Amino acid sequence: MPIQVVSADFAKTATRPEEWPRGATPEIAFVGRSNVGKSSMLNALARRKGLARVSSTPGRTRALQFFDLSYRPTPAARPRAIRFCDLPGYGYAKVARAERDRWTAMIEDYLRDRDVLRAVVLIVDARHPPSESDEDAAAFLVSAGRRLVVAATKTDKLPKARRVLALQQVERALGLARGDAVPFSAVEGTGTDALWARLAALAAEEPQTAEAEPPA
């Protein structure tokens, strides 16, 4: 049964740990290459257009963006709180090196140190094999002890006959079991319920972290 979203609101922007939201609300982070469809995914999950700003300009997100949501896993359940964190996209070459380095440090600090972080959604473009940056991100998250969910976006741009093969390509490249990657299309509205089901289950678990070194 689909998750019922009760409310979804922008919470705050943060660039330093002292600005991160306080409290015990479980968080799910979203990371991926610039222009891979993170904002569209967040809006689809929130059942609210315009919650996260969708831009045609890659690299617009330059800070951590937090969103507070309330949802019911079943119609009879009491509302539960969850927080989404939209991380700056990686792989945007037109950003100055110093700025990219600042983003990288900010993201790595969050992914290592955030004690309420329950899982990270790594978003990849289903039309292409995962990039080296995608593979590095997956390796870093695993080494950090973070629970990883891979979502393959823009499946609507692929012929239906190619979608299964495209997902298998993503899974092989990132070392996932068959069926682990979630196919997602904000245009077709597919994958939202499947992704929500995973995130709600992970939000109910205790956080899990480990010491990590940045990928070489």
Curated annotation (Swiss-Prot):
Gene Ontology biological process terms, A to Z: division septum assembly
Entry's family note: Belongs to the TRAFAC class TrmE-Era-EngA-EngB-Septin-like GTPase superfamily. EngB GTPase family.
Keyword Nucleotide-binding on entry: yes
Gene Ontology terms: cellular component: cytosol
Names of the cofactor(s): Mg(2+)
Function: Necessary for normal cell division and for the maintenance of normal septation.
Protein name: Probable GTP-binding protein EngB
Keyword field: Cell cycle, Cell division, GTP-binding, Magnesium, Metal-binding, Nucleotide-binding, Septation
Signal peptide, first to last residue: none
Top-level taxon in the UniProt lineage: Bacteria
Residue span, EngB-type G domain: 24-205
GO molecular function, one term: GTP binding
UniProt-listed InterPro entries: G_ENGB_dom (IPR030393), GTP-bd (IPR006073), GTP-bd_ribosome_bio_YsxC (IPR019987), P-loop_NTPase (IPR027417)
CDD domains the record matches: YihA_EngB
Positions contributing to Mg(2+) binding: 39, 61
Pfam families named in the record: MMR_HSR1
UniProt xrefs under Gene3D superfamilies: P-loop containing nucleotide triphosphate hydrolases
Positions with a binding annotation for GTP: 32-39, 59-63, 86-89, 153-156, 184-186
